[in-house]
Amino acid sequence: MKKTDTNVLKRVEINGVQYEVVRNDDNCLNVEELSEKLTDYFDPYDYVMGDYAYEKVRLKGYYEANNKKATPINNIKKMDDYIKNYCSYGSKIFLIKKIK
């Protein structure tokens, strides 16, 4: 998992939850937009990844590898495979990790 451009944002609060910014390609993370799109569906996840393509953001939740809820499709160790296979070439990616 590569880390990029985390020098601008290190931690953010979204809807009352603290997150660490792990990855933020070209500073694409828009906290205001994310606060509207980050619903309670993502509450159980340890990470939320967003990919921007064609000026739209798509979100996906991931669990830590050691979380008993982790499966091959939501294990954070498989995120790079997801990006390679399902994200548009050149899309900007951000990854935030819930601070517990």
Predicted regions and their residues:
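Helix-rich interaction surfaces within compact, conserved domain-sized segments
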Residues: 71-100
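Short, structured protein-protein interaction patches enriched in aromatics and acidic/basic residues
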Residues: 51-65
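A residue-level signal for beta-strand positions that form part of recognition/binding surfaces
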Residues: 18, 56, 93
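Acidic, Ser/Thr- and Gly-enriched intrinsically disordered low-complexity segments
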Residues: 37-38, 42, 47, 67-75, ...
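N-terminal leader/targeting segments and the first structural element of proteins
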Residues: 1-53
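A broadly conserved detector of short glycine/acidic/proline-rich loop/turn motifs that flank catalytic sites
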Residues: 25, 63, 100
